[in-house]
Amino acid sequence: MTMITDSLAVVLQRRDWENPGVTQLNRLAAHPPFASWRNSEEARTDRPSQESRSLNGEWRFAWFPAPEAVPESWLERDLPDADTVIVPSNWQMHGYDAPIYTNVTYPIAVNPPYVPTENPTGCYSLTFNIDESWLQEGQTRIIFDGVNSAFHLWCNGRWVGYGQDSRLPSEFDLSAFLHAGENRLAVMVLRWSDGSYLEDQDMWRMSGIFRDVSLLHKPSTQISDFHVATHFNDDFSRAVLEADVQMYGELRDELRVTVSLWQGETQVASGTAPFGGEIIDERGGYADHVTLRLNVENPKLWSAEIPNLYRAVVELHTADGTLIEAEACDVGFREVRIENGLLLLNGKPLLIRGVNRHEHHPLHGQVMDEQTMVQDILLMKQNNFNAVRCSHYPNHPLWYTLCDHYGLYVVDEANIETHGMVPMNRLTDDPRWLPAMSERVTRMVQRDRNHPSVIIWSLGNESGHGANHDALYRWIKSVDPSRPVQYEGGGADTFATDIICPMYARVDEDQPFPAVPKWSIKKWLSLPGETRPLILCEYAHAMGNSLGGFAKYWQAFRQYPRLQGGFVWDWVDQSLIKYDENGNPWSAYGGDFGDTPNDRQFCMNGLVFADRTPHPALTEAKHQQQFFQFSLSGRTIEVTSEYLFRHSDNELLHWMVALDGKPLASGEVPLDVAPQGKQLIELPGLPQPKSAGQLWLTVHVVQPNATTWSAAGHISAWQQWRLAENLSVTLPSAPHAIPQLTTSETDFCIELDNKRWQFNRQSGFLSQMWIGDKKQLLTPLRDQFTRAPLDNDIGVSEATRIDPNAWVERWKAAGHYQAEAALLQCTADTLADAVLITTVHAWQHQGKTLFISRKTYRIDGSGQMAITVDVEVASNTPHPARIGLTCQLAQVAERVNWLGLGPQENYPDRLTAACFDRWDLPLSDMYTPYVFPSENGLRCGTRELNYGPHQWRGDFQFNISRYSQQQLMETSHRHLLHAEEGTWLNIDGFHMGIGGDDSWSPSVSAEFQLSAGSYHYQLLWCQK
């Protein structure tokens, strides 16, 4: 029977979820993950503990629109209409309530600490039997690793406690509430709490028990906390493992702690001591603490490159050696410090190849499983990332163990963001909110500080800068001086950060915002008195078709030592799977669930799609971040290793010389490069081709053997140089038949053998081509100056909020999308060996001329059509997106073959990873399926394109797909696209960059804008 003090009515009346001074009730203190082994060998080998029991699985669930709607009887028994859900999960992914995607704007009315009366509430219940031995002695705990956003817990009708902070564990002592036989848990989860005001991250807002739930049985006298730290001499040849252990329970003289350090099966060091002993101040020391220090000779150091791990086992036992309990953790010997303006790991300056990562799954929402976590880490390592920022909250505890094992540097970030507050520091400068903020920072440190992968603490994200930040910065520095602290808020360089950590600062361009100027990263280093390293906490906003200009950042990182890299925003698109009326899955974004407010597709900024399929931009990141750099002088290749600790022991350098993609010579050389060292490779005499074409030297670094994170044959680095371009000399050929020109009132028609070309005299366009009796065009060949807008072109512009500075709004306002062609000239001439068509068009909008396009089409006796285009751009119109030609081809061929840059999509400001070669791909692979449709699939540096019976030659860029630019521009989701008749071909003489420094302001660098007044290009179109 529920006692009055345990009743739901009492809890509802108290309204703990609207009191920032109440962050928990009866919650146990934070600590590292425990297993409570009763066998030290099991602790050493990390076997599953017999004292731990998972409660994951089917729970009963009932949803209510508000906590007041929950019946009191639910505390005692399941409701008749309760459903079954899987724990962990977000209830929105089971059809209850709706997920909400918003970036800055709070999803509730801003009135802290109060939340709406309509506060969706999930009532979970579970019955279970307890091991009777657990009831006889010791303490049984329940651990909720993550509940969003706040919850009350009852056991057998009695109230146990309350917890909030959705991203850290809430742990309670159940011992007094359990009995023999069947026990019942009841968990009331509220969607909104005062804690929601501290959790305004750019992500889907979801609810429920979304991380693991487990029981843990510990002895009455137990290890209640332990943390380890490593210290070194100057040359890292000797180390000390310092282990601080705390106990709880009856303090007896015969209690001892033993700490043993293991490397595999070998015990490296061990020490035993009683509790107490260390004097803290004039009153003495802690009687329930002990600190042991173990000396280690020549430790194998931990780094992301070589993640050497030891195992520390902490045993609590009696003086006669009887084991009471053991806990354990992996240990990495490594040192992090800032010295002379540089962030150092084991004495070497780091170059952070980082990415921000949200915990997101397209089917499961914010529920992470081990398979997905490992998949993310492997992809990061395979693409030359060495660091990850837990944006913007502590991650699932398993994540850190995996980062320790595989080798990734981690920025561990507190679950604090108040981006929607005005001003942003409204709460973080308010002492009433210090307890809540303190819980989020201190508990993160207490949980995760044993992980060697965690090299930096972060105070949170986008919360302004307040006095609470300064207080928490000081607390971390006093408790854990072994790690730097970073925090971007308030200008990225406040007192509360050891690292200048701006977001979206540009390489050379200042953004002098009021109060918090965002300087260029180069300028920031040179500000008077500034000596800290600079690491961008967010940069290169990878939204849709983006990451233009990425190479510029990496040029700066390698040029200026104190520019020590950054974290790309971000890793994975946050789209969610929905199903149409036929049960077909499709990818949804903000607003697709009826969620208001929402920020549309701004949740999709990933280098990989939600299912972890890579975006093309990921290859650019991989190439720029590669650990081997190359230079070529004559026949000598200089290979420079950017590894700090790893000697190349699993790398072969493959080289190949090819002429227009045809191999002429190749070879293979083992790499033997010391950390930060160089190797010179002398190539044999290279062939000198006699035929025309481009001669390229390509090198690849291949790993012949599999590693923990890559398969055998993995390519880790590559580079390409153009050695020469031999031009052909066209000799007089045998006389060809002269094309025949026929003129009518409406058309010029040119015939040659079985081919015909038709030019409409009213439009001036090539309106049709025939090969035999087969039409080749579904639409005329026309000039094209626009593209289906990228996310970077749109910026923050939307129907209800127009940003006139966005590229798409400039193009719309100027009439680029509405421009119509006025024919100024269309003539035909028969030459000695060809027919020449000359056209001039003025592309106009509302009486204003935007572009003048002059074209000649020369069709000779070989059947080739040489197209020459000269375009003049009006001085008062915005720089165009492209200058090219477009048409709809009648044929749909299976494959596309081209000689140019590839194989992946590339753009003028994102092409350093592309290689010049002859490529052949299915037509479907020429389209990049961005969830929000846009311009996509461009291939630059093309010399030849073959598709169906057609061939184009010249120096151009192209994309080819079943979707027109018009359809891409008018369609909101990729699943709504339909394959059109034929194939759309876009051939560009020039194409604007895509940008990507951020996605809300124009970010295409000047050198990649089409700012010239006139353009000239040529194209040869023939049939094979």
From Swiss-Prot:
InterPro entries found in the cross-reference section: B-gal_small/dom_5, Bact_Beta-galactosidase, Beta-gal/glucu_dom_sf, Gal_mutarotase_sf_dom, Galactose-bd-like_sf, GH-type_carb-bd, Glyco_hydro_2, Glyco_hydro_2_AS
SUPFAM superfamilies per record: (Trans)glycosidases, beta-Galactosidase/glucuronidase domain, Galactose mutarotase-like, Galactose-binding domain-like
Active site: 462, 538
Co-factor(s): Mg(2+); Na(+)
E.C. numbers: 3.2.1.23
Gene3D superfamilies, per database record: 2.70.98.10, Galactose-binding domain-like (2.60.120.260), Glycosidases (3.20.20.80), Immunoglobulins (2.60.40.10)
Binding site for Mg(2+) 1: 417, 419, 462
One Pfam family of this chain: Bgal_small_N
One term of GO molecular function: magnesium ion binding
Protein origin, superkingdom: Bacteria
Keyword Amino-acid biosynthesis: no
Residues given in the record as substrate binding sites: 103, 202, 462, 538-541, 605, 1000
Binding-site residues, Na(+): 202, 602, 605
Gene Ontology terms: biological process: lactose catabolic process
Cofactor details (free text): Binds 2 magnesium ions per monomer. Binds 1 sodium ion per monomer.
Residues under site feature: Transition state stabilizer: 358, 392
Alphabetical UniProt keywords: Glycosidase, Hydrolase, Magnesium, Metal-binding, Plasmid, Sodium
A GO cellular component annotation in the UniProt record: beta-galactosidase complex
Binding site for Mg(2+) 2: 598
The reaction(s) this protein catalyses: Hydrolysis of terminal non-reducing beta-D-galactose residues in beta-D-galactosides
Self-association state and partner proteins as the record states: Homotetramer.
PANTHER family according to UniProt: BETA-GALACTOSIDASE
Family affiliation: Belongs to the glycosyl hydrolase 2 family.
HAMAP family: Beta_gal
UniProt protein name: Beta-galactosidase 2
Organism: Klebsiella pneumoniae subsp. pneumoniae (strain ATCC 700721 / MGH 78578)
Lineage: Bacteria, Pseudomonadati, Pseudomonadota, Gammaproteobacteria, Enterobacterales
